[in-house]
Amino acid sequence: MAGEAINAGKKWEAEQGFLRGWVAHIFHMKVAGDPFKELIGSGWKPSAEMRDPSRWPVRLEVPKGPITVEGTRRNARMLVEYVEGWLNGRGAKGIDSLAGKPGIHPALMEDLATGRMSTARIAQRVLHRVRSEDGALHDFALVKRLLQEETDDIIKLGSLSGEAAARYRKAQKIAAQWIRNYTAFDFRSLGSYTRADLDRIAAGPEAL
């Protein structure tokens, strides 16, 4: 079903004159790319009108919806969990950002893109000094507290100790630095850090 929807959307994009498209997951690269290849392969070419940038104005819209500390907390937990997996040699990790809470919510496989999105969401709220529905101000102090609380909760729920607990503490400090970097418009990817770089961050002062 998802593949069919993606294929239909990319077919529409190709027919509007776009030569290639963006897809969220590598699994859908073929289904997303085929409409462009097939149309271009048929000899079809976009018209001159389709090349006019004014046909595609950029729209910057602020989405409507509640802003909650709980949402920021879930992103903080996801980020700590992901960085822990990275430190443990995994580029993707099954993460339940609602672990320990009532209800059925299985872990979802998350990768580096999710880590970057969680980092960006938190950093945006800090940069814009967003207040949640209950009036809480998003600043470094709040984010630091959420990272600490979620790390503590992960360790407690998993009854972790020793090396495993230490890895989560290390992940917490790296996550904090990653968020701090984004608020300074430094979008360096986690993949560009060496093990030595990450060790220095973990051994250094708190970023937040």
Question: Which role does the model predict for each range below?
Answer:
Residues 1-208:
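Expand to "…catalyze enediolate/carbanion chemistry for C-C bond making/breaking, isomerization
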